Amino acid sequence: MSTLHKVKAYFGMAPMEDYDDEYYDDRSPTHGYGRSRFEEGYGRYEGRDYSDLRGDPTGYLPLGYRGGYGDEHRFRPREFDRPDLSRPRLGSWLRNSTRGALAMDPRRMAMLFDEGSPLSKITTLRPKDYSEARTIGERFRDGTPVIIDLVSMDNADAKRLVDFAAGLAFALRGSFDKVATKVFLLSPADVDVSPEERRRIAETGFYAYQ
């Protein structure tokens, strides 16, 4: 094409069909808004519950793949992450083990009730009802320290036995002391039980093993 014809085509004096140049091509431009490589391969994922981007005018990303997991949480606490409330705490376990060790320690018990100790003749009675009060009175009258364990008795009978034992201690100049819950020590006049010895009786749980 001559230079004059190109000038005419530029100013509209010649039809564009006659304008033939190496830079002009009626084909689609090489760089444009054609289908992207992503869209060309998109059809392979249409059957797997992926959100469709092509019809979304907002251009936001899809929520993602919805298959397989549903609406459940992706992460759940593992079994060993959950606190097990049925297990005992360490502090309570140590306290219980300490009491158990004291109760089963033969050396502590031997020191407390060795020969010559005022408590060497001690006996433990576990009355079931008030009718056994006579046995308690006879042991106490004979000069034997008596541990009275009323745990298995109902409160009414236990109260009557406590009153009876307190009366015995007063009448015969003895002593009547509480060792533990519903457990009492009735001591004759010639047996002096110190507060430390009463504490050791409670700690060793001696009355529970007689």
Curated annotation (Swiss-Prot):
Pfam families: SepF. GO terms for cellular component: cytoplasm. Its main location: cytoplasm. The gene is sepF. The lineage of its organism: Bacteria, Bacillati, Actinomycetota, Actinomycetes, Mycobacteriales. Cell division protein that is part of the divisome complex and is recruited early to the Z-ring. Probably stimulates Z-ring formation, perhaps through the cross-linking of FtsZ protofilaments. Its function overlaps with FtsA. The keyword Amino-acid biosynthesis does not apply. Homodimer. Interacts with FtsZ. This is Cell division protein SepF. GO terms for biological process: division septum assembly; FtsZ-dependent cytokinesis. InterPro entries: Cell_div_SepF (IPR023052), Cell_div_SepF/SepF-rel (IPR007561), SepF-like_sf (IPR038594). Keywords: Cell cycle, Cell division, Cytoplasm, Septation. HAMAP family: SepF. It is found in: Cytoplasm. It comes from the Bacteria. Belongs to the SepF family.
